[in-house]
């Protein structure tokens, strides 16, 4: 990833913490979205919106369905940024 992609990923983490009222230290790569962070299906829709805000692209529904952890989300954000 280049510096711009790193900045966007950091911006994504900040948005994630703010939007879902999470402590930044809770956004560990292994943190499970539903079980550990207590996100629900409405939050999942908001998460897709945050991903689009950061990358300018919609996440593929199939890929989004497989996202379970913060690390999974970050990998998808990186993939979308690389493929800009």
What annotation goes with each model-predicted range?
Residues 1-25, 78-84:
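Thiotemplate assembly-line natural product biosynthesis machinery
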Residues 13, 30, 48:
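Generic structural marker for isolated residues within well-ordered, non-membrane alpha-helices
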Residues 18-38, 55-63:
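Phosphopantetheine carrier-protein modules
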Residues 25, 45, 70-71:
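Residues in well-ordered alpha-helical elements
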Residues 41:
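Catalytic nucleophile serine of serine hydrolases
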Residues 44-66:
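Phosphopantetheinylated carrier protein domains
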Residues 65-83:
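C-terminal structural segments of small proteins and small subunits
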């Amino acid at each position: 990833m280049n510096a711009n992609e790193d900045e966007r990923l950091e911006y994504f983490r900040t948005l994630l913490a703010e939007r879902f009222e999470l402590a930044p230290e809770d956004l560990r790569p292994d943190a499970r979205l539903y079980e550990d962070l207590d996100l629900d299906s409405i939050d999942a829709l908001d998460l897709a919106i945050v991903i689009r805000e950061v990358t300018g692209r919609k996440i593929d529904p199939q890929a989004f369905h497989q996202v379970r952890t913060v690390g999974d989300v970050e990998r998808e954000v990186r993939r979308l940024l690389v493929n800009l």
